[in-house]
Amino acid sequence: MAKDLEALARRKAKVRRAIRVAANGRPRLSVHRTSQHIYAQVIDDANGETLAAASSLEKDLRTSLKTGADTDAAKTIGKLVAERALAKGVTAVVFDRGAYIFHGRVKALAEGAREGGLQF
């Protein structure tokens, strides 16, 4: 168990280092997923503030989504966070998948954000 957690931490740190190099002043779209929900934030690391956020826990989404743990919910969250980021004037971001592989819900969120108008 400890080796798994260490590998997860190493993978997350590796992704963050690559993002810092590639960012060029762009904010990052950070993804967090649990077994029941998915969360996304657009974070400006230079100023240390969150510019936009969306999650499957929001009341208006909980009634419209079947569950917060499927690819349809992730795609909806991606579109919503893109809409909120565009309202704040953010058009280009760096995608931060954290320690998660780019597959399933994480990929669906990225596709939703691209459809919503974000470029990365």
Curated annotation (Swiss-Prot):
Role according to the record: This is one of the proteins that bind and probably mediate the attachment of the 5S RNA into the large ribosomal subunit, where it forms part of the central protuberance.
InterPro entries reported in the protein's UniProt record: Ribosomal_uL18_bac-type, Ribosomal_uL18_bac/euk
One Pfam match: Ribosomal_L18p
Lineage: Bacteria, Pseudomonadati, Pseudomonadota, Alphaproteobacteria, Hyphomicrobiales
Self-association and partners: Part of the 50S ribosomal subunit; part of the 5S rRNA/L5/L18/L25 subcomplex. Contacts the 5S and 23S rRNAs.
Highest taxon in the source lineage: Bacteria
Protein name: Large ribosomal subunit protein uL18
Gene Ontology cellular component annotations, sorted alphabetically: cytoplasm; ribonucleoprotein complex; ribosome
Family from the record: Belongs to the universal ribosomal protein uL18 family.
GO function terms (MF aspect): 5S rRNA binding; structural constituent of ribosome
GO biological process, one term: translation
Annotated keywords: Ribonucleoprotein, Ribosomal protein, RNA-binding, rRNA-binding
